[in-house]
Amino acid sequence: MGLSDGEWELVLKTWGKVEADIPGHGEFVLVRLFTGHPETLEKFDKFKHLKTEGEMKASEDLKKQGVTVLTALGGILKKKGHHEAEIQPLAQSHATKHKIPIKYLEFISDAIIHVLQSKHPAEFGADAQAAMKKALELFRNDIAAKYKELGFQG
């Protein structure tokens, strides 16, 4: 299910827009995730108390987490599918420490797509959306395979 060179080019061109404002994109992605899927908040001790979008946007911890998430994802995307070294520790921590279900990775992938559509409609057309969805699915599938190796039924 790999991506073509052209698809990776679209993914990385779009990701360049994210990198121009990682804090802003990260906050938007997490707020979208938590408002769309409030159950995901339970996996974050620092955010469990945040109930409204305003509270979420005011949280410095949430902003920092958004930067952490998108910085890690950017590093993985730049590997163009050759991300074994990056995926292993991420899967390990998400399976054994954080216990993050794969479904939640689907939710955040959807939030990322939504944010990119909202913030960059001209640059994030159908081809770029399809390529990004494919790249995020590859990431999730590889995390899921590692989860299975670790015996985590996430």
Curated annotation (Swiss-Prot):
Gene Ontology biological-process annotations: removal of superoxide radicals
Annotated positions binding heme b: H94
Keyword Phosphoprotein assigned: yes
Listed Gene3D superfamilies: 6.10.140.2100, 6.10.140.2110
Pfam families for the chain: Globin (PF00042)
Subcellular location: Cytoplasm, Sarcoplasm
EC number: 1.7.-.-, 1.11.1.-
UniProt keywords, alphabetically: Cytoplasm, Heme, Iron, Metal-binding, Muscle protein, Oxidoreductase, Oxygen transport, Phosphoprotein, Transport
Entry's Gene Ontology molecular function annotations: heme binding; metal ion binding; nitrite reductase activity; oxygen binding; oxygen carrier activity; peroxidase activity
Main localization of the protein described in the UniProt heading: cytoplasm
Enzyme class: oxidoreductase
Phosphoserine: residues bearing it: S4
Entry keyword annotation includes Iron: yes
Ranges where the Globin domain occurs: 2-148
A single GO cellular-component term on record: extracellular exosome
Modified residues (Phosphothreonine): T68
Catalytic activity: Fe(III)-heme b-[protein] + nitric oxide + H2O = Fe(II)-heme b-[protein] + nitrite + 2 H(+); H2O2 + AH2 = A + 2 H2O
Family (UniProt): Belongs to the globin family.
Quaternary structure note: Monomeric.
PANTHER family per UniProt: MYOGLOBIN
Function: Monomeric heme protein which primary function is to store oxygen and facilitate its diffusion within muscle tissues. Reversibly binds oxygen through a pentacoordinated heme iron and enables its timely and efficient release as needed during periods of heightened demand. Depending on the oxidative conditions of tissues and cells, and in addition to its ability to bind oxygen, it also has a nitrite reductase activity whereby it regulates the production of bioactive nitric oxide.
UniProt protein name: Myoglobin
Organism: Loxodonta africana (African elephant)
Name of the coding gene: MB
